[in-house]
Amino acid sequence: MRKDWCEARKNDPTPTQMYYAKNGVITPEMEYVAKVEMLKPEYIRQLVAEGKLIIPANINHTNQIPMAIGRAVKCKINANIGSSALASDINEEIEKLKVCLKYGADTVMDLSTGGDLDEIRRAIIANSTVPIGTVPIYQIIHDIKDLDNLTPQIMLECIEKQAKQGVSYFTIHAGFLLKFMPLVAKRKMGIVSRGGSLMASWMMKHHKENPFYEAFDEICDICAKYDASLSLGDSLRPGCLHDASDEAQMSELAVLGELTKRAWEKNVQVMVEGPGHVPFNQIEFNMKEEKRLCHDAPFYILGPLPTDIGAGYDHITSAIGGTMAAFHGASMLCYVTPKEHLGLPNAKDVRDGIISHKIAAHAADIALGRVGAIERDHAMSDARYKFDWNKQFELALDPDKARELHDESLPQDVFKEAEFCSMCGPKFCAYKISQEIAKIECSDYPKEKK
């Protein structure tokens, strides 16, 4: 879709959406986003220029359909896929990607840590019409084998290689500073971020500052070259309710706010990552603190999970917290699957995670009065009242699941025309009774005696 657009500006010195926006240019990507979100193109340009909205769109991912992340547009959801050292199958990852696209993931992150990472990533980008994000430290550690071998040069080479492939955003753990280590010691669960734990290990062994922080300007230069956005990772996100909103988390968040401004100076788009495990009554506070400390950059959050005991059902736990977070300003929800805390998700887990978080994001969009958000719900209400079963399946966030559950008890085609379902049957259907009542003429009512 974007091949001609990207070709036309391939020789521009800074081909980023933010650069064009700051210079008054409305790109085709901005126009497309404006149409999808039912907003004015100039408004989209202004938000991108201010850093309040990002359009993650690497110039080398030309089959990607433009989308936007920010408070002014509908809440988005991300789905994670990727191999592990114990389970690496490129075909399975492509199947997971297909599930992500089918059920409406707005972005996908390849978090592979095992197998041929370059080939897995190449295949995912080639088959994806949504932005692909990565966490470069995973490949860095995979390639160098030993964390002690990490150098800034190796780090930058890996990021550029992935940017050349078409990665549209990078999670960079640059806000975790050496001076925060004593704060981590006060926690019940320490560091639960994989990238954060690797950086902590490196800093403690070498007694040096975080190399991602030290090389942040060079990382921004690479991102500006390919219009890859930065997703500033929260290495110190709370992994349990006990650690939520603590000094470690907030100290890192303040640094992420500083890094956001530095990236903007280089015309690099930024979103900020957030928690994590957070009690329900602290979610609003966390959203407002990010807005304050990070200058209203889009907030991309994992959950948050308002309880620690939902193992096996954490896609539900996360969706509960995610709805509240999105209502108070989160711009994108990273899905959590039923396998969270338990193992590597399969395609079914991916589907369940996506749908639960699509529900959460959509509920927040309705509550916030976002343009067009409630229209699908109104259409569903009409279809239900008219017993239009096929239309109901079509309008559902998961049409396959809706049809499957209906057909468990009434599989024959004749029941797609029936004015009842298996719950109430033909005699106790409230919709049917209500429709019969509505047919009664007013003249049929007893007249009031004077």
Swiss-Prot record:
Its cofactor is [4Fe-4S] cluster. GO terms for cellular component: cytosol. It comes from Campylobacter fetus subsp. fetus (strain 82-40). The gene is thiC. GO terms for molecular function: 4 iron, 4 sulfur cluster binding; carbon-carbon lyase activity; zinc ion binding. Binds 1 [4Fe-4S] cluster per subunit. The cluster is coordinated with 3 cysteines and an exchangeable S-adenosyl-L-methionine. The keyword Nucleus does not apply. Zn(2+) binds at residues 277, 341. Catalyzes the synthesis of the hydroxymethylpyrimidine phosphate (HMP-P) moiety of thiamine from aminoimidazole ribotide (AIR) in a radical S-adenosyl-L-methionine (SAM)-dependent reaction. [4Fe-4S] cluster binds at residues 421, 424, 429. Gene3D superfamilies: 6.10.250.620, Radical SAM ThiC family, central domain. This is Phosphomethylpyrimidine synthase. Homodimer. Substrate binds at residues 80, 109, 138, 173, 193-195, 234-237, 273, 300. It catalyses: 5-amino-1-(5-phospho-beta-D-ribosyl)imidazole + S-adenosyl-L-methionine = 4-amino-2-methyl-5-(phosphooxymethyl)pyrimidine + CO + 5'-deoxyadenosine + formate + L-methionine + 3 H(+). InterPro entries: ThiC, ThiC/Bza_core_dom, ThiC/BzaA/B. GO terms for biological process: thiamine biosynthetic process; thiamine diphosphate biosynthetic process. Belongs to the ThiC family. Its EC number is 4.1.99.17. PANTHER family: PHOSPHOMETHYLPYRIMIDINE SYNTHASE, CHLOROPLASTIC (PTHR30557:SF1), THIAMINE BIOSYNTHESIS PROTEIN THIC (PTHR30557). Keywords: 4Fe-4S, Iron, Iron-sulfur, Lyase, Metal-binding, S-adenosyl-L-methionine, Thiamine biosynthesis, Zinc. Pathway: Cofactor biosynthesis; thiamine diphosphate biosynthesis. It is an enzyme of class 4 (lyase).
